[in-house]
Amino acid sequence: MSAVQPQEAFAVPAWSSPLAENPEVVLELRNLTKHYARRRGQSAPPAVQQVSLQVRRGEVLCLMGTSGSGKSTLLRHINRLIEPSSGEVLIDGSAISQLSAQELRTLRSRRIGMVFQHFGLLPHRSVRDNVALPLELRGEPEALRHAAADLQLHAMGLDGWGDHYPHELSGGMQQRVGLARALVSEPDILLMDEPFSALDPTIRRDLQSHFLQVVRERGITTLLVTHDPAEALRLADRIAVLRHGQLIQVGTPEELLKQPADAEVADFFQEHGARSATPMATIAPRKSATTPAPLSPGLSFAQALLLGPAALAASGRGGLYWLGFALELGAVAALGQGLATASFAWAALALIGLLSSRLLSVALARRPSRLRRSDWRLPWLVLLLSQALVLWRVLATDASGPWLQFPADRQVLLGTAAAIDQLIAWSQVTFESTFVGVIVAVRTVIESTESLLGWLPWPVPALALVLLAWRSAGAALALTSAAALLYIGLFGFWERTIATLALVGSSVLISLLIGVPAGILLAKRALARRLITPLLDVMQTLPTFVYLIPAVAFFSVGKTPAVIATVIFALAPMIRLTALGIQEVPKTAVEAALAHGATPWQILTKVELPLAAGSLLLGINQTLVMSLSMVVVAALIGAGGLGYDVMTALRNIKGGEGMLAGAAIVFCALIPDRIIQATLRQRDRTLHQS
């Protein structure tokens, strides 16, 4: 096989489309506009406004402008990483807005390559796999895509670096990898978003020369985003100058130097060549749309003195309102005590508290502030009502009635409880097959796990655990694991430990099967976050034994309801940490995969989940520890295991036996926790080492 055969294997016919009006024009932007959603109280000018531009085949066009001018936003419209609010992007005369999802992925993976300012490399993959990513996303065979990647690495001067990882390369080398990845599918359009700005000057100049040589040799149409005038003048055939989302001027470097469109364009390039003395026109710079919030005037002395803490609430200082609230209630209580006992000391204390609160209110509420103001009426009414009730409570020695004791109705409680019982009974009849299915599935998992662990000769799991501990964290944890196993075996806890591990392992497995998909949904859907997050908050605040009530109500007693209660108790951290891991995946890595034709499933499985593995491991660890914390509580409904030994010891008031069984539970939590923590530290060193 010749050196070029891998690349030839990926060659595709030209994208079928109507002929462009101008055969030299490969890319056209027509009246492109992009509006983003407005923030509350602020106007949002268009990020891109009515931009029309044509790019000829093989041309290097620089999108030039200061930060915030819309360069990168405009560039991302070309491969639909950003959808326009209006206008069209045409490639070879065909509007890409009409492409289906599959056609768009084909366009990205075969015709358009993209290079990013911050590289967008996947830290968990080798350099070779990073370069071959666009071909992998297309489903090309491994041998062909690796051969093509090696060919591009050779062209970039990176021979021998294919088996290394991105953190082992310098910034310039990483950007060469990014350029090789963009070119591996032989695109005819190359998008480059400030690819040289993060590099040292010497590395930058060398990589610029190499880039220019490659695109000239291959005839690649290139759009290069930059804010560096020298870079644009040196690399571009033409330069498009943008300002506040508007296209100000398009021309060759010579035209921009000799005939700038206005004074700002002239000033932009003045240090890099001669320019005309008189610019063609002057366009006033647009004022920033965002201005600081105006100062709100403070309250008058009389208002602040009269309202007291309510003045602080009205001026946006809610925390200080509660401090004044507490001071004044204390002052009122002291005043009531002074009136009841005719004590001067209590009256003086009341005066001090009241003065402290009012002086604090006057001093702070009169100041002008940018804090958001609110209405004073409700805080003031709550303060007055609370003061009146506290004063009444102090003065009324035989206080009773509904103001002191909340009115309760036992019949309401009994009626509500009966309604809940009826609902449970109805559910058990209506959804009997569902409950039976859940019971069978959970019991199968428990019994299979317990049977496997009980069937194995004890040295097999013991040796496996010690070896895993040694490989994960070294000799210290291996010795600790051996000591824990000796303790469990010597004191006769082995069978109980097997039962406990079956219970906990089943709970962790089910939590994984439910928690990971739920966490992914939580990370990707705002509606799911709004609906599920309050439920997770409730799940994480209830006491452990509360989870036994619905489990027993629907599934009776035994190991099955114990596992279900444990899953409900331990599920919330798995969901939250999965969502957190997905949300913390670098946007550049996701965008790079998307720009090269990844499907949503490929982004999830090849980018997000691998990079979120650390958070997933933390979720597993937290779920494991929380499941073990339920062992004793679950023994109340027949879960067995080490929790049964602890409960028996407590019931018979045998503290020694209870402590020994409890120590065995601690060992069951300690060893996996240390193994997972060591794995996380090793992973962090691998991904973040520089």
Whereabouts are the PLM-identified features?
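Conserved ABC ATPase "signature" region
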Residues: 95, 136, 143-161, 213, ...
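Catalytic Walker B motif of ABC-type/P-loop ATPase nucleotide-binding domains
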Residues: 190-193
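Helix-to-loop junction immediately C-terminal to a conserved catalytic motif
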Residues: 79
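Conserved ABC ATPase signature
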Residues: 165-169, 173
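ABC ATPase "signature
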Residues: 250-251, 259
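Conserved catalytic motifs of ABC-family nucleotide-binding domains
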Residues: 186
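Transmembrane alpha-helices
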Residues: 564-568, 600-634, 656, 660-672, ...
